[in-house]
Design a protein with these regions (language model features):
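Charged, glycine-rich active-site and insertion segments that engage polyanionic ligands
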Residues: 7-113, 117, 124-186
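Structural recognition of the conserved hydrophobic beta-strand(s) that form the central parallel beta-sheet
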Residues: 1-7
Length: 186
């Protein structure tokens, strides 16, 4: 019998998964994680964005060293705003988005960050007093929350979940992001 540990149970084959013993650990508190990354010299906005993607400090720090995450974050925010205000421009904006998110890791980070943007809107909509992932955009987030219905937000969550699946199945990233625009918030 071999002992194996995995932090990605979704990548284990079903036949093996059924024979596994599952042990779940509570992930680090998001606020603590963000503060830890800030202490490690990341900017708060980048740390907040990375907290949507990982709870592993090493992963977050290496991504920050390898890539220009400040620029990626700005592009993601711009694209999210286009999704809500001008869908035809959001389709065109995919080109800029994928120029920044040029590999699978960054594309998954982008999807997680987009999900975080809509999570903030949902928190504002239900008036949950939690920390926003995009703390510097709280005014804009609340404005979007007033204009979106619960059904629109749920539809967007469904599209983002589907996009994650498709990206993990190696579907062309342009097609994945186009589907978010086409089938997302209307």
């Amino acid at each position: 019998i071999r002992d194996r540990l995995s932090t990605k149970p979704e990548q284990i084959l079903d036949t093996i998964h059924s024979r596994c013993q599952h042990v779940y650990f509570k992930p680090i508190d998001k606020g603590q994680f963000i503060n830890h990354l800030v202490d490690e010299s990341l900017t708060r906005p980048v740390a907040e964005m990375l907290s949507t993607y990982t709870t592993q400090a090493e992963t977050a720090l290496s991504l920050n060293e390898e890539y220009d995450l400040t620029s990626l974050r700005k592009t993601i925010i711009r694209w999210c705003e286009l999704l809500l205000t001008n869908r035809s421009m959001a389709l065109i904006g995919i080109i800029d988005l994928l120029k920044q998110a040029k590999n699978r890791k960054l594309q998954l980070l982008t999807l997680s960050a987009v999900n975080g943007f809509f999570e903030d809107i949902m928190h504002a909509k239900v008036e949950v007093n939690s920390e926003y992932i995009y703390s510097d955009l709280s005014v804009e987030i609340k404005k979007y929350a007033k204009h979106l219905t619960y059904n629109q937000l749920i539809l967007m969550y469904d599209q983002l979940t589907e996009a994650h699946k498709k990206l993990n199945q190696n579907v062309n990233p342009t097609l994945v992001f186009e589907q978010i625009v086409i089938k997302g918030v209307r």
